[in-house]
Amino acid sequence: MARCYSGAMARMKPLPTVWIVSDARNDASIERALARLPRGSGMIVRHYHLAKADRRQRFDRLKRLAWARGHLVALAGDARMARRWGADAAYGSPATLAGGPAVPRLVAIHSLREMRRAARADAVLLSPAFPTRSHPGKAILGPLRFRLIAARSQVPVIALGGMDGHAAKRLKWPRWAAIDAFLR
């Protein structure tokens, strides 16, 4: 598996198994959620609902809190922005992360076709594994299809969509990310 990592990923801390994804709906309690994450987890800062200056300020605060607990921090956006803002990694679609400087890339995918487009990915977030509040009514992958797609990946796969510790066990998958799981 080590040969699959880019040079940027090799310089990064070990890839966390548990991730929290920021969102407008968990923003008010994200600090509390960060404290509940196991040490050395990951955080993907999206905060699309904020203006750029406010988003930067929020990112800097969350990054400090996350780093104090040994968490890795990925910024949703292109690789240039992630590098400028001092993120550990960039998070986005295959198209958003196709170019730019060498930073670790976490690419959001929903199908085998999108996985093929994620050529510069260091890891992929495959969703939706299960029903999710983010995309109500959207078709899900389910455990079987999720594992079939994940088995074709050349890079680590992180499950997203309706995930929490119980869903990860049901999916039989070690790496997972969630928006709501740590708010309970």
For each of these PLM feature ranges, what is it?
Residues 11, 42-103:
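N-terminal active-site wall of soluble small-molecule enzyme domains
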Residues 1-32:
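N-terminal amphipathic alpha-helix/helix-capping segment at the start of soluble metabolic enzymes
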Residues 23-37, 78-80, 111-117, 164-167:
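Short, acidic/polar
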Residues 20, 90-101, 123-140, 160-184:
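Glycine-rich phosphate-binding active-site loops on the catalytic face of alpha/beta enzymes
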Residues 18-22, 72-77, 87-94, 104-110, ...:
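Short, hydrophobic beta-strand segments that form beta-sheet elements in well-ordered domains
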Residues 32-39, 64-68, 119-120:
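Acidic (Asp/Glu)-rich catalytic clusters
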Residues 20, 43, 82, 118, ...:
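Conserved, mostly hydrophobic/aromatic
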Residues 85, 101-151:
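Glycine/Thr-rich beta-alpha phosphate-binding loop at enzyme active sites
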